[in-house]
A protein has these predicted regions:
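Short, charged beta-turn/beta-strand-edge "cap" motif at the junction between a beta-strand
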Residues: 42-48
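Short, structured beta-strand/loop micro-motifs enriched in basic residues and often containing a Trp
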Residues: 16-24
Length: 69
């Protein structure tokens, strides 16, 4: 799984498989890509995996709100 962590100087700094950070050229990502999106390789670039992104956001949100219960 590749998750966009942040953008720096024309690159997306991404977490790959929870183990390492990789740099992906911003040109290879959809214009709508943002921090926290899960992306997968597709052709010569990457696409956003909307289902995985939403599932991940929900998990993070549940953990966050669980801290206050």
């Amino acid at each position: 799984m590749i998750i966009i962590d942040r953008f720096e100087e024309g690159f997306a700094i991404c977490e790959k498989d929870g183990m390492e950070l990789i740099k992906i050229s911003r040109d290879l990502l959809p214009e709508t890509a943002k921090e926290g999106d899960v992306v997968v390789a597709f052709g010569d670039g990457y696409i956003i995996d909307s289902d995985a992104t939403e599932k991940r956001r929900k998990t993070v949100e549940d953990k966050f709100f669980g801290l206050f219960n």
